[in-house]
């Protein structure tokens, strides 16, 4: 009976393997699964993927650095452009004020001339359009002639009938306003002021502000 009992014990031990023999090397089931899975993966492919990821990371870092530099440059350029724009807007507003002042003075002078010399003003008024057209035609002819010939050609003078001193001053004033010549305009304003000063019936004065 003792021999049979020992034989049964040996058979039971042989039929049930231990944990170490099942998993191998005394590792747990999870570790054994991971090792088996790692053995199925090619290590060369894994290293290639890691290198590709590192290269892409470096490219992304360089791209981010370039974008940061571009943003900084754009901000500096925008700041300088904004300052220039504000300065130009301020300059244009000042120029508009000056032009408003000049045209207001011109209207005042025209009203004075109309009140002092109504007959001459009515006679000269229809000639404004013809004088402007003649000046425009002369300008176009001069530009065309200059384009055709290399040598500069002298412009033809505009002939006008001299009615009186006040009429001449008025016609020259209109030409100066049309051409936008500031120096001639100031000189003509001085002449008109001298004509007004010579007239004893006119109580208005002409200061240096009129020529400003």
UniProtKB/Swiss-Prot annotation:
One GO cellular component term: BORC complex
Name of a matching Pfam family:
KxDL
Bias (Low complexity) ranges: 148-157
Source organism's superkingdom?
Answer: Eukaryota
Extract the InterPro entries matched here: KXD1-like, KxDL_dom
Q: How far does the signal peptide extend, from start to end residue?
A: none
Annotated spans, Disordered: 128-159
The processes (GO biological process) annotated in the record are: lysosome localization
- What PANTHER family does the annotation carry? KXDL MOTIF-CONTAINING PROTEIN 1
Family designation: Belongs to the KXD1 family.
Q: What is this protein called?
A: KxDL motif-containing protein CG10681
């Amino acid at each position: 009976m003792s021999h049979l009992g020992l034989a049964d014990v040996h058979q039971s031990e042989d039929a049930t393997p231990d944990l170490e023999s099942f998993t191998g090397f005394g590792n747990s089931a999870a570790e054994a699964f991971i090792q088996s899975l790692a053995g199925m993966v090619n290590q060369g492919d894994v290293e290639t993927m890691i290198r590709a990821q590192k290269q892409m990371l470096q490219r992304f870092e360089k791209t981010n650095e370039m974008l940061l530099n571009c943003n900084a440059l754009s901000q500096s350029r925008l700041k300088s452009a904004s300052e220039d724009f504000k300065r130009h807007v301020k300059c244009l507003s000042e120029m508009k004020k000056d032009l408003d002042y000049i045209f207001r003075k011109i209207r005042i002078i025209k009203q004075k001339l109309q009140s002092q010399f109504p007959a001459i003003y009515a006679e000269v008024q229809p000639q404004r359009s013809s004088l402007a057209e003649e000046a425009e035609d002369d300008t176009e002819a001069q530009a065309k002639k200059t384009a055709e010939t290399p040598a500069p050609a002298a412009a033809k003078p505009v002939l006008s009938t001299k009615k009186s001193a006040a009429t001449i001053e008025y016609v020259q004033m209109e030409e100066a306003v049309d051409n936008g010549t500031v120096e001639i305009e100031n000189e003509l304003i001085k002449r008109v002021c001298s004509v007004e000063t010579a007239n004893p019936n006119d109580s208005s004065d002409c200061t240096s502000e009129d020529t400003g």
